[in-house]
Design a protein with these regions (language model features):
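Bacterial Sec-dependent N-terminal signal peptides
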Residues: 1-23
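Metal-dependent phosphoester/phosphodiester hydrolase catalytic core
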Residues: 21-442
Length: 442
């Protein structure tokens, strides 16, 4: 009788623990990092209490806990919690607890706080990954025929590069016709994409930042007239972990973050956008308020490299599709303002085009070259494109297959170097370029 009782207890305990493991829908994911706090994210598949426990890698006996949070259906069972007992320049392991039980994973769950380096040492070496256009197939809602998404092992290849963080350049998910007319559809699509098995190790140990483009905002080529743009903004913020959004106070996801001595300006190319087909008045992608904020923020920045992150190509002279060249007056206004303000170290990062290319614009010998790195696509269909009408393209950098980038910044404070490397889905290097910060000055 006692043996039966013990067996029943063990069986019940095993079921309870298994049930806790099964409650994870996606994640955990590591969001933004600062010197004193880090965002941690997880999604359960039903209502549950979640919290995180974390500790320094070299001092595992002293453990810290986040607050506890109850995930609810209204918020897609998403939990976002802050690790607020971190100290600068430390590496941490963490565990996630669901209904009081620790969830085990067979891959690393770790994060880092940023270093306190200024006035003390040279800035740290920095490595970050970039990519755009991530299409995860769901046959029930996809177009008939050949699946549009493929090569999901690319996320294992990114993970193997061990970047400090990943910067998602838009179209990070693809809303379908069944999604973009309801909040329920948004939550489903973001959940489905975030739950991709190949993505989980990368989410768990690399910090993540993101902007959007049309496909994670609404319908194809969607603009400011989109009827659910506030819902789009809400769900984007729910599923991502940027440190701030809507810094202009006019709606949307415009934001900013720093990593080491680098500054990143996260632009919103959808919320205030004029329809591509509307030529009756002032045409804009970003809008004057966002551009004026950007110029002011760039002027304040003393970063050797100032990365302007936006969903679509800026420098390309091809007046095609959704390039900024199609909105020529605003493009001219933006670039003129950057030159007029004597802002140094500008590099655009963008996606959208389903191919990768580096563009370089230098109007005369009296100004430094501005670069625009287009990196696309991760898993959505990739195509060869010669960018025939892009006067600024560097021919040898065109890539027409699924790919990602790793950008490394090294060197002393007054002599920083950016090394751009593009890899295929298997992590094999396709090309690299070096850009010196001292070459991006007047």
């Amino acid at each position: 009788m006692k043996k039966k009782f013990k067996s029943a207890v063990l069986f019940s305990l095993l079921c309870f623990l298994t049930n806790a493991q099964d409650l994870i829908k996606s994640g955990p994911m590591v969001g933004y990092s600062t010197m004193r706090e880090v965002l941690l994210w997880v999604q359960t598949n039903r209502e549950a209490e979640v919290y995180f426990e974390y500790y320094e890698k070299n001092n595992p006996k002293i453990r810290f806990k986040t607050e506890r949070l109850k995930t609810v259906k209204k918020n897609g069972f998403v939990g976002k919690l802050i690790a607020d007992q971190v100290m600068p320049g430390k590496e941490y392991n963490y565990d996630v607890f669901i209904n009081g039980k620790k969830i085990k994973r067979d891959y690393a769950m770790e994060f880092q706080s940023q270093k306190l380096w200024k006035w003390r040492t040279d800035p740290p070496n920095i490595n970050f990954a970039i990519g755009s256009c991530n299409y995860v197939n769901e046959k029930e809602f996809d177009r008939p025929g050949k699946p549009y998404g493929s090569n999901f092992e690319i996320f294992n290849s990114i993970h193997d590069k061990n970047p400090d963080f990943m910067l998602w350049l838009g179209d990070n998910t693809y809303l379908r016709e069944s999604d973009w007319n309801s909040r329920t559809g948004f939550v489903h699509r973001y959940t489905h994409t975030r739950s991709l098995p190949e993505l989980q190790p990368l989410l768990a140990s690399t910090h993540h930042y993101a902007i959007w483009d049309d496909h994670d905002f609404g319908p194809n080529n969607s603009d400011s007239s989109y009827w659910l743009k506030e819902t789009a903004s809400e769900i984007f913020q729910l599923f991502w972990g940027n440190p701030n959004y809507d810094v202009t106070g006019n709606g949307g996801i415009t934001g900013f973050f720093q990593w080491g001595d680098l500054d990143f300006f996260l632009l919103d190319n959808r919320y205030h956008r004029t329809s591509n087909k509307n030529f009756t008045g002032t045409r804009q992608i970003l809008g004057s308020d966002q551009i004026d904020w950007l110029i002011n923020a760039l002027s304040f920045s003393d970063a050797p490299f100032k990365f302007i992150v936006v969903g679509g190509q800026v420098l390309s002279t091809e007046s095609l599709y959704e390039n900024h060249a199609v909105f020529s007056e605003e493009r001219r206004y933006l670039l003129d303002k950057i030159r007029e303000a004597k802002i140094e170290g500008v590099i655009f990062l963008d996606g959208d085009r389903h191919h990768t290319v580096l563009s370089k614009m230098q109007e005369s010998k009296y100004v430094y070259p501005i670069y625009d790195l287009t990196c696309s696509s991760l898993t959505a269909g990739a195509y060869k494109n010669d960018e025939t009408f892009n006067a600024y393209k560097l021919e040898e950098t065109l890539v027409g297959e699924n790919n990602f980038g790793v950008l490394s910044v090294v060197g002393s404070k007054n002599d920083r170097e950016l090394i751009v490397k593009i890899f295929n889905k298997d992590g094999e290097e396709l090309w690299r370029k070096s850009i010196k910060s001292n070459d991006l000055k007047y």
